[in-house]
Amino acid sequence: MRIKFISLLKGTAYPLNKELLYTIANNISSIGDVEVVDNAPDLVHVFGKWSGTTATTMKGYTHKGIPVVFTSTNGLVDVLPPHSLMLAPTVFHCCGPAEAELIKKLLPKASVKVIANEQFTLTTDRTTMLRQFNDLYAKVYNEHEAKVMSEINNKVRTLNISDHAINEICSQLLYLQYAFRRETIRQRLLDNLSDTLINSNYDEESMRQAFDTLKISSFATSVMALLESKSHLTEGFMPIAASDDKTTKQMQKHII
């Protein structure tokens, strides 16, 4: 899992949880299967104040479909109702139950997780804290992915087609479209789609009709060109003609 840590701290202020970010970012990779990155994250952890700037930053990621964990750098100190109502992370991380209770009071539907900062309590230690964060990141990411796949499956069901191959190919294309939106296209997604296209039998006209119904025909033509240049698909296995266009070139930039 690729995680990006963002600090929105400015000036010479020394908030309570300033060191927490650096502790997690510098040590989390030793606990689980985590890679700390600057680009193409699977999940983002934002440390900042309860402010409009923080809200805008988080919205930029959630709009792309990237889950966000938020930690208030000053705990309860900066919690103000006008600001809190603008914040919409996937999960609020709190260092104590009082902060969690206040967030739930202000935002009853918010998802909140309490993980104590080991610098300020004897009830935990660094290793335990890091494991809790690793578990939190995995849970947030996995639940987000499950939600994405559920939405994709619901879209594919609207086709009302019994052909498994068409349903599977459409599902993979829709997930690739989602990966493109979040600017994180893994090579294995391309190779898996190439394999599925090569090894599946389907009616090409029905496939093209499915693309039209899902409004992904244009995207599919761009993907065919991408699979030809960056994977192992050849023209004979394409259900729709390839188009090496602007979208193809943009997708190439986000392959990891």
Question: At which residue positions do the language-model features occur?
Answer:
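Conserved NTP-donor binding/palm subdomain of two-metal-ion nucleotidyltransferases/polymerases, i.e.
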Residues: D135-I256
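C-terminal alpha-helical cap of glycosyltransferases
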Residues: Q119, T123-E145
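Short glycine-rich, flexible loops that bind phosphorylated cofactors or substrates
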Residues: S51-T53, V77-D78, E101
